[in-house]
Amino acid sequence: MFPILDARDFTLQYMEYLGRNVMDQGPSPFKSVLYAVYACAANMLSVARGTHVSHDGTEYFELALFNHYQNLRHCGVEEVQCLAILSTCAASWNNLSESWKLAGQAVRAAQDLGLHINFEGCENDQSRSRLWWCVFTLNSCLSSCLGRPAGIVETDYNCRVPDVVEESPSLLQQAPNRPGNR
């Protein structure tokens, strides 16, 4: 799996999200990422159970896109994460054309944030680097599979490859299991 999300950051944001009053939860960049994660998870759950449920994740996919478009004025890594996760989700549904388009948007959003540039010494250098290389690889693989242009010129980026780090599952195990009607 692509390390699009930092497990620790995502879990902390998720726990904060669950602690908020439901009435105070309008559109937010994190919410678009969360719905994208739910879309992927819903699809995996229905496949794992061997059921043909009507909820295969498309509703969450649409909610993620809706929240994403409502938050376009708030540019941040959540925009890149949402688009990249939705791209992998579309690919898992064998909708490679949609996946390629979403991956291309994720690359452009990452470039807009400067993730393609080497920022050594930055506090979140590793997570920025991981996210860039995830969207770069996702876009390149899809472009190659479909015979379409990747849209990334090698001279346009100098982001170094991130270090290999094993993430601790302990924080993920602490997260409450309540997707519910958020």
Task: List the predicted regions and their residue ranges.
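C-terminal transcriptional activation/regulatory domains of eukaryotic transcription factors
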Residues: M1-E78, L83-N95, C122-N124
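Fungal transcription factor middle regulatory core
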Residues: E16-G19, V47, E62-N67, A110-R182
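Short sequence/structural elements of tandem HEAT/ARM alpha-solenoid repeats
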Residues: H55, K101, E154-T155
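Extended, hydrophobic/aromatic-rich amphipathic alpha-helical segments that build helical scaffolds
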Residues: C82-C89, A103-A106, L131-C134
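A short, hydrophobic/aromatic-rich structural module that often spans a beta strand
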Residues: A84-E98, C159-S168
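Classical protein tyrosine phosphatase
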Residues: W93-A109
